[in-house]
Every structure is written in C-alpha cells, then in structure tokens.
Design a protein with these regions (language model features):
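Short, Lys/Arg-rich cytosolic juxtamembrane segment immediately N-terminal
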Residues: 7-17
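Catalytic cores of phosphodiester-bond hydrolases, prominently lipid phosphodiesterases
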Residues: 2-4, 17, 21-368
Length: 368
C-alpha cells in the first residue's frame, strides 16, 4: 500500500510540474508582450487620469483630452481647434470655404483600428491611448473599425475577442450623438470584416443593430450609381447624409447577395497603399511604402488611403509619423507616385502629433 501511494504521489508530481512550467512561461510571455506593445510609458506618467466621457457638445480641444494638462502627452501643439468656422458662416468639416468640394476631394485624418484604445481596455498592442470619441472632438473625421462576431454577438474588436471589445451600439450611439451636436461635420467610416476572431460576421445583422439607434441610418449616404459623382460636403450637410461607410474583407455585394444600403464595398470605391511597416525607415521608403494594394482592381475608385502607422503599433514612433512635417511629405510623395489625391491618412495613436491641423491646412489649400 505504501509503494502504491508513493507511485501515486510520483504520478501527481510528474503531472504538476509541467503545468507549473507552462503557467510560468505564459505569465512571462504576457508580461513581455504588455511591456513591448502597450504604451506603458505614457500610461504610467498620468496613471490614466480620470478621463471624462465626451458630452456630445463641441467646446474645443479640451473635450478631446479631458483633464490631461497641456504639457503632458498627447503632444498636440497648443491643442489645435479643428472648428475654424466663424459663428453664422457656412461650415463643412471645420472650414468655411470647402463646402463646394466633393467628399472624395478632401482629406480626412483617419484613426486606424479606432476602437482599440488603451483607455477602453485594449491592453495588448493597442492602436491608441485614448478612445475614439475623443478623436472626433480632436478633428478626426475618419473612423476605421473592425467588426467581429464574438460568441454570436457583433462587436468591434481587433484580432481576437479576448484582446478587447467595444459594443456596436455604444460606439454608434456616440458617433450619432456627435453628429447631432455638430451638424456641419461629415464622417468616413471604413469597416474591416473580421471573420476569424470567432464566428462569421453577418452584415445584415450588423445593419439591423445600426437601425436600433434612433436617427443613425437616416444619416448614412447611399451611393446608388457607381459611376456617378460623389456629393459635395454641402450637399451631404444639407441632406443630413453625413456618414459615408465602406467595408472590406467581407462579402462582395454582388447582385445575388447585395449588401445593406450604404455599406459600400471599399475595394470598389477606394484604394490603399501598403501597410506592413516595421519601423520608421520602412514608411520613409516611399518607393515601396506608397505602392498601391490591389491596383489591378481600379474601376470606380474615387478615394485614396495612405497608411501611416507601424505593425505592431508604436506609440513612440507615432509622434513622428503623425507630425505635420512628416505626414505632409508622405501625403505629397504618395499622391505624386500614385497620381491620386489623398483622402484618408490612416494613423495610430491619434492623440500624438497634429494630423487634424495638417488636414485643415491641406483642405484650405484645395479651396484656393
């Protein structure tokens, strides 16, 4: 009996040690990933101060950054006020003199994977420090989101459901509220369909969730004729069709399987540059970084997106990539190489740099 008990103890010991070793390896790996990819440096210096949720009423850049002192990150010089229109004057996306331009003629600062913020619990490899609602107040008029089906529930996630999610209802209610409070603003929302996070994404189910938010789908523009010109900003504002949505990596919206109204196929109407850049030097090599993806599919493409971020995301490098001088030169180089006007400048860590300021500079020049 004693030998039998000893053998049993030996078996338990043999089974236990591998489990302990595996657990230790997983713990160390998690710590390394968190240290390497999460913006710990910036998080620690502020201990993520008591961020105020956005109220929906625009009162300037203070709304975007809450109680973060001007001398702390985010490093936006003088907290540029995107809304440049004088009271009582015609206004479109913060400027008075661009309303006559079509929506496919102007530039939009676009938050890449906008849902994946450290503030909203995306701790492993977040794309942003602060949530997307603040980006709207800061002047970002492009919001890129990834749709996932997590255990039957459609949410916004990045990569895997376990790495963080944001509710579709919550995000779109915030966007809808922002537009209600800012009736001169027009938004671009490119959606990536992620069918690999868990289950497949059903766009009809996604659209149904959108219809549950009062007034949201009424603001969604539908481009009925692929060859027709896109509306001007003024036409979008006057008709209150101020949300322009696109999707990619999902259904192809053929006649036999049409997509919900207003969910346009991105590859049909837009084209992007390369996006897999490991360091700043990769981005600076415009001979390759400005190359077009799927350029053989050019047909009715009216929009041109320039990717301006690293993979995996880099908080430190984003300060340079999102600076006015760097982004201005990248837009110029890619536009010249592709012979296309840039519409989307996709960025991580939107709170760094000054892309909204560059956008207003760029769009103001277009109006001259």
């Amino acid at each position: 009996m004693e030998d039998s008990g000893k053998e049993e103890d030996d078996k338990k010991s043999c089974c236990t040690w591998p489990k302990i070793i595996v657990a230790a390896i997983l713990t160390v790996t998690s710590c390394v990933v968190l240290w390497k990819y999460a913006p710990i440096d910036s998080a620690i210096d502020s201990i993520l101060p008591k961020f105020n949720k956005t109220s929906g009423e625009y009162t300037g850049m203070g709304d975007a950054f809450g109680d973060i002192p001007p001398t702390q990150a985010p490093s936006v010089p003088d907290r540029f006020n995107f809304m440049q229109c004088k009271q009582g004057k015609e206004c479109c996306n913060g400027l008075t003199k661009i309303c006559h331009l079509r929506v496919d003629e102007v530039l939009y600062a676009t938050a890449h994977n906008a849902m994946a913020s450290f503030e909203d619990g995306f701790l492993f490899g977040p794309n942003h420090r602060l949530q997307l609602e603040r980006a709207l107040f800061a002047g970002y008029r492009g919001i890129n989101l990834d749709i996932c089906n997590c255990a039957g529930l459609l949410v916004f996630c990045h990569g895997y459901c376990s790495l963080g999610i944001r509710g579709v209802d919550e995000v779109f209610a915030s966007i809808n509220g922002f537009l209600d409070s800012n009736p001169t603003e027009v938004l671009m929302i490119p959606l990536e369909i992620n069918n690999f996070a868990d289950e497949s994404v059903d766009l009809d189910q996604f659209y149904f969730q959108m219809t549950q938010i009062p007034g949201l789908t009424e603001k969604v523009y539908v481009h009925e004729n692929a060859g027709a010109p896109w509306p001007t900003l003024k036409e979008a504002v006057d008709s209150n069709k101020r949300i322009f949505m696109f999707h990619f990596n999902g259904p192809d919206c053929t006649a036999g399987d049409p997509c919900p109204p207003g969910l346009h196929l991105y590859d049909k109407y837009a084209i992007n540059t390369n996006w897999e850049f490991r360091n700043k030097e990769d981005v600076e090599d415009t001979a390759t970084s400005c190359d077009l993806v799927l350029k053989e599919a050019l047909s009715h493409q009216a929009f041109f997106g320039v990717n301006n971020f690293l993979s995996p995301p880099s908080y430190a490098v984003s300060k340079t990539l999102n600076s006015v001088d760097f982004a201005r030169e990248r837009i110029r180089a890619c536009s010249e190489q592709a012979n296309l006007d840039v519409n989307f400048i996709y960025a991580d860590f939107w709170s760094e740099g000054a892309l909204p300021e560059l956008v207003q500079e760029h769009n103001r020049e277009l109006a001259r």
